[in-house]
């Protein structure tokens, strides 16, 4: 029948019924809102009963909808009347989950609207329902991604750069505003009467061009995991030198992930140099609690010749605490 079709636009679905006539039940064709196909149905007994329910499918079974919506029934004609339901918020699975009884009888042509105010997916195994439509968090994520793409282009294409960085083996272009926002040290360079402010140049002679590019990629938000992993020791030094605390913390976490016998002494030295307490404890635990000190017997003499005396004292105290007789 022609009057079983439901028209949709955005979050509104409208079912125009040309003639309900003497029949006591009518069901609409499926219509899609969100990720589900829906049906409306009407039935006349003592009341006009309007039902909203999802089409039985794998999607509605595995990802049942939690819908917040309003129903409205109106007749067509000069004496138009509107009947508006309460705002429902329900988990909808079957035809009986939402039944709205309208205390009026409609004859001839009338319209049923359903306006979805919100739609969420209810986890079958419990937990918090997840929204189908964009939320503030979603829009924030989209905005962040767009901003990062713009920053990436600014760096890669040298768009309106205003500072030159001289590294050990080449030069790079950057933006004073980005550097200043990321580092109090860079900010001080450009806000006081220092050489960097006058010449619009920065000398970072203790970093290669490749490592410095990794630093800029981090500050501009487009560094890759591979790039970070490759240059993390150089990045750690730069983070400490230029007071980039979040980068310093990220480097420490990364260096904690792959401590082994071939790098533990080097990591311990880095931890002491840059005051990385978590990394230092991790290295000492690896050496003494787990007994890996025996695996570095050949390297330990050279390490002790170069190590800071306070670090050596701390290592000795760690030995005493681990091997303390019961």
Swiss-Prot record:
UniProt comment concerning the protein's domains: The BTB/POZ domain mediates the interaction with some component of ubiquitin ligase complexes.
Impact of changing residue 204 to R on the protein?
Abolishes the interaction with CUL3A
Question: Subunit comment for this entry?
Answer: Homodimer. Interacts with CUL3A and CUL3B.
- Keywords, comma-separated and alphabetical: Ubl conjugation pathway
**Pfam families to which the protein is assigned, alphabetical:** BTB
Gene Ontology biological process: protein ubiquitination
Q: Part of which pathway?
A: Protein modification; protein ubiquitination
Instruction: List residues of the BTB domain.
Output: 161-228
Superkingdom of the source species: Eukaryota
Q: What does this protein do?
A: May act as a substrate-specific adapter of an E3 ubiquitin-protein ligase complex (CUL3-RBX1-BTB) which mediates the ubiquitination and subsequent proteasomal degradation of target proteins.
Presence of keyword Secreted = no
Name by which UniProt lists this protein: BTB/POZ domain-containing protein At1g21780
């Amino acid at each position: 029948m022609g009057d079983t079709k439901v028209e949709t636009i955005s979050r509104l679905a409208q079912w125009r019924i040309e003639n309900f006539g003497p029949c006591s039940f009518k069901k609409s064709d499926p219509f899609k809102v969100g990720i589900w196909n829906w049906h409306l149905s009407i039935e006349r007994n003592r009341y006009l009963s309007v039902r909203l329910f999802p089409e039985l499918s794998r999607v509605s079974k595995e990802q049942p909808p939690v819908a917040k919506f309003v129903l409205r029934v109106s007749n067509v004609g000069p004496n138009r009347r509107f009947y508006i339901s309460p705002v429902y918020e329900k988990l909808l699975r079957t035809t009986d989950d939402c039944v709205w009884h309208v205390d009026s009888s409609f004859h001839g042509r009338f319209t049923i609207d359903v306006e979805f105010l919100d739609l969420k997916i209810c986890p079958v195994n419990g937990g918090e329902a997840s929204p189908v439509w964009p939320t503030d968090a979603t829009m924030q994520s989209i905005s962040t991604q767009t901003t990062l793409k713009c920053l990436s282009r600014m760096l890669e294409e040298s768009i309106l750069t205003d500072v030159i960085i001289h590294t050990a083996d080449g030069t790079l272009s950057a933006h004073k505003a980005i550097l200043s926002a990321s580092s109090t040290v860079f900010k001080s360079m450009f806000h006081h009467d220092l050489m960097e402010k006058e010449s619009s140049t920065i000398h970072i002679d203790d970093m290669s061009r490749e490592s410095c590019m990794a630093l800029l990629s981090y500050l501009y938000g487009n560094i890759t995991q591979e790039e970070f992993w490759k240059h993390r020791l150089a990045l750690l030094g730069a983070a400490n030198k230029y007071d980039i605390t979040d980068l310093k913390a990220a480097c420490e976490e990364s260096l904690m992930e792959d401590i082994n016998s071939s790098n533990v002494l080097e990591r311990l030295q880095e931890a002491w140099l840059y005051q990385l307490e978590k990394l230092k404890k991790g290295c000492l635990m690896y050496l003494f609690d787990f007994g890996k000190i025996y695996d570095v017997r050949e390297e330990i003499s050279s390490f002790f010749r170069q190590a800071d005396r306070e670090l050596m004292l701390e290592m000795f105290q760690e030995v005493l605490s681990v091997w303390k007789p019961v």
